[in-house]
Amino acid sequence: MEKTINIALCEARHQMPECVTGAIYPNTVDPLDIAGITETADVFMREHSGDVVNVYVTGLTVCTIAVVKAALMLLATESARPRTLTLWHFDRATGDYYPQTIIYGKEENAVGEAILYYAYNC
């Protein structure tokens, strides 16, 4: 059953909207541990196959890239995939978050839809 997951990228790094529950990574992450960062992202994306995933980006580019890569690898290689992956970035001017949709897939042609969506909307 499809769920909507609202999660921070890294725990307790910034103020989060009330809808956010939990984080993919702990507050302290070793940015040089690419293998560990990648494994965490892979496990998270597999656990949320079929879900609408909203990630509130709270720092560490290396972690953001690992999450996007994990989702795209699932799209390219397996039937398990997030239904939607949207990154939410903080706007200092407004104090709100704004979306960047990375994957928007419905059913069978999710890879093609994701590529076309990204190419024309990003």
Regions from the PLM with identified roles:
Residues 1-54, 66-122:
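Long, low-complexity, Lys/Arg-enriched
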